Every structure is written in C-alpha cells, then in structure tokens.
Amino acid sequence: MKTDFTIEGNLVDIRQRSIYPARLVISDGKIRTIRRLNAAKTRYILPGFVDAHVHIESSMLVPTEFAKVAVTHGTVATVSDPHEIANVLGTDGVWYMIENGQKSPLKFNFGAPSCVPATSFETAGAEVTAEDIAHLLASPEVRYLAEMMNWPGVIFDDPSVQHKLDIAKRAGKPVDGHAPGLMGKQALKYISKGISTDHECYMIDEARFKLKHGMKVIIREGSAAKNFDTLAPLINKYFGQMMFCSDDKHPDDLLEGHINLLVKRAVARGIDVFKVLQMACINPVEHYGLDVGTLQQGDWADLIIVDNLTDFNVLKTYINGDVVSERGRDYIKTEPERIVNNFNIGLKKPSDFALPLTKTDINVIEVLDGQLITKVFEGKISLENGLATPSVSDDILKVSVVNRYSEVPVATAFIKNFGLKRGAIASSVAHDSHNIIVVGVTDEAICEAVNALIAQKGGLSATDGTHTEVLPLPIAGLMSNESAEIVAEKYTALVNMARDLGSTLTSPFMSLSFMALLVIPSLKLSDKGLFDGEKFVFCPIER
C-alpha cells in the first residue's frame, strides 16, 4: 500500500470549465478527495496529456525509452498503432511492443493492426490475418482496431476488410480511420462502416465534412506531416470531436516536445484553454475508453503540474500517483532490450540500381515538404547507353526500394524535391512494409548507402560517395537499443549530413520514409514498382 500524500495547486476542471485552488489527497495511486482552498496558488494541476495516435516505432525508440522522454512533456498515455513492427514481424512484433511498454509507467494503449501488409502491391515481412486480429482484440491489452488504411477496400465492400470491421464490432472496440482527402459519397460510405476517427485530414474542407458527419478528427503534427495550422480554425466549433496526435515523431523532435507543444500553440492562437485541454486530455480517454485519470475524484492520479496556462512548462508528471518526471528529468528505469529482426538479403552492386528506359519523358514523384502526399511531376531525364540518368540540375534524382525480406530485383524510379547535389541517403524505415528506400545522385552512392544498412541489418545512412554515416536500428530495422539522447544525436548528425549533400527538406529522412507508403496518394514506389495511389494501380515510369 502506498503512503497517502497531498498535491496543492490551481485545479483546472476541464469538464466544469473552472479553475480553483485545491488540495488533492492521493491514496493508493488514486485521487481520494478534492478539497477547495481559499488562497490562489502559483502552479496549475491538469490531467495528463494523451497522444491520440502514434507509431512509437517512428521515434526509433522502444516504448520504454519513448516513455522516458514523453513523460517529461506531460504525456501520461498514448494510443499506439504497432503496425510498423507488425509489417516486419507480425503479431510477434505487436506483443514485443506491448510487453516492452508494460515495463514503463506510461500508459501505452496498443491497437490491432488492420492492414498488414498495407496493400497487396508491396512485400512485407509478415501478415496479420483476420484470425490474428480476432485474437488480439480478445485481449484486454489491445484497445482498438488500428487505422483502416485500405479505404478502397472499405468503400467497395472487400469481404476481407468487412470481416475485420465486423470482428472489431463484435469485440466492442473502436475502429481508427485513415482516409486522406476522402470526401462526399465515398467518405460517407467509409464512415457508415463504423470507422470513427481520421488523423490524415490535410484540408480544412475535408476535415469539416468528416466532422459534420460524425467522425472524430485528430489534428496531427509530426516530424513530416504537419496539419495543425490548417485544421486549428475548426477547434472552436468542433473541439468535442477533436484530438491531438503526433503520428510519427523522430527522436530529436520528441526531445523538444510532444502534445504539450500543440496545447501551447493552440492557446497562443487565442483558442479557449478549456477547449484545447479537452482535446489533449479528455477526448482520447473517453473515445477509446482508456484507463487514464482525468482529474476527477476516484480517478487514477494521472496528472501534471504546470507553471502557467500559457507556456505549459511541465514541473511534475504523475502516473497512478507516482512522480515519473520532474522539471525535465524522468524517473523511469529501463533495462537492455532483446533484439528481434527480419533481414534476409546480401550486399548489392551498383548495377542493381540501373534503370533501362527507351523514353526520356517520365513520371516523377514530386515530394511536398511537410506532407505525406505527393504529386505527379512530368519530368525529363537523359539516357546513356539505354540507361536512365538523374537530372541533378532539375532536382530529379533516382529513388529505389530494395526488398529486405528476399533476394529480388530492385525497384527504381525518379523523385523530385529532395535537393541532393551529391551522394545518397537511405532508410530501412520505409512505411509500411519497411523495405530499404534510398534516394541518390549516382548508382555507386545509392549502392553504398544501401549496403551500409544491409551490413547493420537496418538503420538510416548518408554517404557523400567516400564517407558514410549510419544510425543502426537493430530492433526490426526500426528501433535502436540506445537512449533517446544518443539516438537523437546520431540522427541529427545524419540530417545535417543530408543537408550538406544539398537536401532542403525540413525532415529529409522522415519524408523519405513515406515515399513507399502506397495508401497515401498520389505517386509512390514499392519494391514492385511505381504506384498510383489514387487509382490504386501500378504506373509506368515512361510517359
């Protein structure tokens, strides 16, 4: 039994829209009593923040290391989709995340991945079947059916997709959505299937349409996709249906802040603080039925102390009544984590990346900085002895996807807006199947960047052709077994090297990791070829 203790401060009662000085008595991890006081206090007591949709693997940290950083920013819980590791290791990967997360006080709430592999147009390392989903959802540790990315399968009544939705309905667990740009009759059909959220809205009219028809919209601000500024104007009217999430956040950005930064930005825009805090603290708990306290008598003492309601500097974070962080320092103990992986290929040759073509007019993937969507650019390249060569002056570079699960030919196409003038950058974090993706100026540099990752069985790399830097990610080729600070330092060095090579993207490795994500339009590349994400068919390189 824990010793009772008290916490005093200006209590922010979000539901009652009131702030008053109070003394909380914490007993056995829960709020036993809340007593009003007469004198105002200098600090504020809030419910802890909840990230309503995040892939922990994108931080390149295992859950326990993610938790050590997140709690310093006032995060007490996450709604986490483990489909990244599931694409590599199947349900073994899901349980790896759950078991690792249980070693931490942070309340990780994992979902059952709904689309592994994401499509049939790529090669993943594993499959999560409907039977697997049923077993996962039968477990109390699995809270929901994770994002249904196969929106064509939903709106065209694919039996296998409907079966998964039915399993979630029978289990009484919510279904997360993923339908970027979907509006009108197609969106209505998607919503009618019981899919309740979408974190992929990138247009205000799209988000408004979905909100009007009953969906919950989660405002995303990650390392690559940043939708806060676009969607924030909807908060005043629709705050009861909205939440905040990071989705995919690299370690350097996570060290800077988490959901607390979105709260601060929203309040700075003049949005009512109670509306903002309802999105950050209350709505995810209620929507997903999380076992997370919201500062009510009898709740778990999952709360934070902040200095004011403008900056939201986190002084202390409590989870189940335990202090897990104080003034930027965490109190979470970790232990070495076992290595799991799925990497089955040998080293490549520069000739593996050669691309024979007969035409010089081609379809090019056009990257949009700060977005996961791409455009189709009508580009022109040169041919040398029948082989396509990049046009560095026009910023049209080679992009290749290397299947890491079996020895098959490399898929190569062209991409614009990475800005590299020399060298190459590569990643085994390549949503969602997590093959190796690489962008570069020459076949030799591309091959060097890829081989550096094959040798390490996963990671991120950058090369100028003579010098190569690598951030190893030995756990599933997605996560490090080192601390957030070490990973962030190595990652920042790689980003700086990418910029030295010419990249002008805000987050070149995060953007690179989404260039093989076929379920987000318009043009992407899988290990099987160039893909039209709007028509959901393969696309010729030559025009």
Regions found by a protein language model. Name each.
Residues 1-22, 27, 32-35, 71-73, ...:
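Active-site microenvironment of metallo-dependent hydrolases
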Residues 46-53, 80-83, 111, 146-148, ...:
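Active-site neighborhood of phospho(di)ester-bond hydrolases with catalytic His/Asp-centered motifs
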Residues 50-62, 117-130, 196:
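Active-site mouth loops of central-metabolism enzymes
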Residues 67-174, 470-472:
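Divalent-metal coordination cores built from histidine and acidic residues
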Residues 82-85, 113-114, 150, 180-181, ...:
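Short, ordered loop/turn segments at secondary-structure junctions
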Residues 93, 127-146, 153-218, 223-244, ...:
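Histidine/acidic residue-rich metal-binding segments in metalloenzymes
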